[in-house]
């Protein structure tokens, strides 16, 4: 098992460790801190977990997953186009609006939460649909909001 500070490379190892401790047949699965859901997704691919209960102390994260799962097309169109830029001003405007509406569980809050995390990810090494640094044809990484197709595909998990 890895240490308390988890790097993205360790998620697969953690999933393997957890998977080896689980029985072959699982009736219920509870994930107390789902975070990026990397561990749950990897486990689900291996075990086909029935009736998963996903939780996290971050209410905005739970709202985000709720809207992606239940209304992926509407969620994709929720952000205001003016806030889709990658400028410092756009990020500051998003943060200000988020502070005004946080903990209300609205689709707008969830969309802004995702956008803020995408913009903040510019400084990290995250990859994948909600880590959002995508590979281009030339080894460059670019930051993009997930496409509507990606959000709909992710919602089918």
Task: Name each model-derived stretch.
Residues 11-14, 21-84:
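Conserved S-adenosyl-L-methionine
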Residues 1-15, 24, 71-157:
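SAM-dependent nucleic-acid methyltransferase catalytic core
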């Amino acid at each position: 098992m890895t240490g308390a500070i988890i790097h993205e490379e360790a998620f697969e190892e953690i999933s393997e460790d957890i998977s080896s401790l689980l029985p072959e047949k699982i009736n219920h699965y509870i994930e107390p801190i789902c975070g990026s859901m990397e561990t749950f997704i990897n486990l689900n691919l291996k075990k086909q977990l029935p009736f998963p209960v996903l939780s996290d102390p971050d209410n905005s994260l739970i709202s985000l997953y709720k809207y992606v799962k239940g209304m992926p097309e509407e969620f994709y169109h929720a952000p205001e186009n003016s806030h889709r830029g990658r400028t410092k001003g756009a990020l500051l405007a998003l943060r200000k609006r988020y502070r005004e509406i946080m903990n209300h569980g609205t689709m707008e809050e969830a969309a802004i939460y995702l956008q803020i995390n995408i913009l903040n990810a510019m400084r990290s090494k995250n990859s994948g649909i909600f880590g959002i640094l995508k590979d281009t044809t030339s080894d460059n990484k670019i930051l993009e909001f997930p496409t509507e197709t990606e959000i709909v595909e992710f919602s089918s998990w």
